[in-house]
Structures are given as structure tokens and as C-alpha cells.
Amino acid sequence: MKTRFPSPFFILYRRLTVAISFGKVLGWGCLGRILSWMFSCIASFRRKLFCSAPYRASSTVISVGNIVLGGSGKTPTVLWLAENLRARGYSCAVLSRGYKGKCSRQRKLIVVDPKMHSAAYVGDEPLLMAGKLQDGAVFVHKDRRVSAKHAAKNFDILILDDGFQNTKLHKDVEIVVVNGQDPLGGAEFFPRGRLRDFPNRLKEADFIIVNGSCCLENQKLLNTWSSSPKIFVEPCISQVLWEPSGEQLPLDSLSGLAAGVFCGLGFPQGFLDMLKRAGVKILGTYLLPDHAGITKKELHYFSSKIALRQGRGILCTEKDGVKLGNLVHEQGILPVGKVQMRFDFANHEDSGVSLLNRIDQIHNGKR
């Protein structure tokens, strides 16, 4: 008889891949030191190898990137920029490489349509952003010069998603997003830490967005590496979209809710802490590697586990939610709540305005 649950071997495999992605296996001992050194050498060599004259697009190009492996908050930053620049009268397009999407491997230029495309084809983040952008577009191609040439024909501003390591496209504004709790990713390259680039490159940033609570010690650490203006933001929950009902509930609906949580994030602890602050009673977690989607069998397994603990639902991020597709309609699955988030400015809205004003100046200077 065919089981609807994953095998114990698959669950073990999942736990192992999560542990590896967080540096809890390969980061041990001499092996970890050797692999971290190799990773840093590759990062250095790659930058020197591709350090040629970058392509200059006719539109203003804003890069949003980081120096660690995932979990810093790039996607909310991109969406915040696009929304606020649109409010100032600009047309915006997002340029993504479609990480883990099939079309990126095929080197096809795709303008993402949420009604036509899946996360498996274009990538989870491009699909999420395309569904949220108003009057904008998300272009996916492995070579961002190709997408920039096409997007510049119709859009004033091009936002380069995960663009800090991109040397092929000229960037007018360089924004680096860091996690306030761990801005330097443990200060070691993967797998001993979460660094993907050298901290001294922070001095190349025009603005640094510090996402989440940042203690005085971490602020001093950031100031040691870069004198660029810091914008402190606090991610918070705006509402929860429950599937399959489509019901949208405010933040206070989470208070006292007993639920399970699954997510595929580079820094899942930040999401879990946010839910706890909102009053969620977390009955269990199912962690996935960054960008990985939960399978049908895994969802049945986790839902049954939470139901046995008298849970009322399962919570996940919007990024995880776009990968679910029709799985939310599976019989026997608890309701799935997709948690939607927004930014609050910790050092006043003026800090965000200064960034937008800087983009205004640069864009007007290019005309």
C-alpha cells in the first residue's frame, strides 16, 4: 500500500541537508577550515576573473545584495524600493537570475507572469515579487546584462536582485542588506560560517540596510568595516493569508494560536522569533534548506504531526507559500497560513527618504 508520508531515510536526508546548509556538519574541524578557505579563494578568484568593463544600461540600476548566504532580507528590501519608487512616479523592473528555477539553467529571458509560471520554473523569489509588484515586472535571466537591455526599453529604474557580487552590470546605487543579529555571518566563510564575500567589501556599499535588532556591539562591528550610511529596519508581520479559504487576518489573530511552522530560509531563527513575539505557540518546526520546497508527503507528515498536538494550522513565509501550489487543497492538510511581512524603520522614516532622495538625484543626473 502506497504511504502518504515520506520514508525515514528521506527525513534523515532532509535533516542532513539542513545541517549542511547551516554549516553544522561540513564546518567541523580541519575539514571545515579547509572548505572555508577554498570557498574564500573561489570568491576572490571569481571576482578577479569577471572584473571587466561592466555594461551600462540606459536606465538607473540599483543593486540589492548581501555578503552572506541567504537570510538577510533582500526580497522585502527590493519590494519596499519598488513600491516607494513607484509612489514617486518611477516605473520599476526587477532583474533576477531565478535561482533554482529551470528557466535560469535554460538561459531563457522570461518576464514572470504569476498566472502562468511556477516557482519551479522561474524561482520562488521572482514569482513572489511578480505577484506583489504593481505596474512593474520581474525579468529572469542568468546574465543580467541581457535582461537589463530589454528592461531598459520600458522602465526607468532597474532593481538588481542579489546583485552585490555581479560585476558584469554597472550599478548606480549599491545597497547591501545585513542581518542585525549576525551581520557578518559568523565572520567565517561557508561552511564554518555564512560568509559568501569578504567583509571589507562593505565599504563599497552606498547604503547598508540593517534588518532586525542590532546590538551596540554589532553596530560597532559594522562601523569598523564601513562608514556608509546605515538604515535600521525591523521586519514585522502585517497579516496572514490562510489557504485554502483565502481569508486574510491581521497580526493580532496570531496571539495564542497553536500551530506548526515550516520554512526554507537561510536564517530561520529570525522568522521563528517573530512568530513567538506575535504570540504564536509553536508546536513543532520543519526546517528546509534555503529555497527548498516542501513535498506533498512532507506536508502530510508534518500536518498530521501538528494535528496530533491539537494544532490549528501550519504557518510559513510567503516565499515558502508560493512553492506550495495546489498542495494547500490536499485532503487531510491543516489550514496553511502564509505570513506576510513589512518593514518598520527603527531610526525614523527619514533614513528611508534619504535613500530615495539619493536615487532621485542619480536618476535625474542620467537624463
UniProtKB/Swiss-Prot annotation:
A GO cellular component annotation in the UniProt record: plasma membrane
Gene Ontology BP terms: lipid A biosynthetic process; lipopolysaccharide core region biosynthetic process
Amino acids binding ATP: 68-75
Keywords noted in UniProt: ATP-binding, Kinase, Lipid A biosynthesis, Lipid biosynthesis, Lipid metabolism, Nucleotide-binding, Transferase
EC number(s) given by UniProt: 2.7.1.130
A GO molecular function held by the record: tetraacyldisaccharide 4'-kinase activity
EC class: transferase
Pathway: Glycolipid biosynthesis; lipid IV(A) biosynthesis; lipid IV(A) from (3R)-3-hydroxytetradecanoyl-[acyl-carrier-protein] and UDP-N-acetyl-alpha-D-glucosamine: step 6/6
CDD domains found in the cross-reference section: SIMIBI (cd01983)
Reaction it catalyzes: a lipid A disaccharide + ATP = a lipid IVA + ADP + H(+)
Function: Transfers the gamma-phosphate of ATP to the 4'-position of a tetraacyldisaccharide 1-phosphate intermediate (termed DS-1-P) to form tetraacyldisaccharide 1,4'-bis-phosphate (lipid IVA).
Family: Belongs to the LpxK family.
HAMAP family: LpxK
Protein's recorded name: Tetraacyldisaccharide 4'-kinase
Source organism: Chlamydia caviae (strain ATCC VR-813 / DSM 19441 / 03DC25 / GPIC) (Chlamydophila caviae)
Organismal lineage: Bacteria, Pseudomonadati, Chlamydiota, Chlamydiia, Chlamydiales
Gene this protein is translated from: lpxK
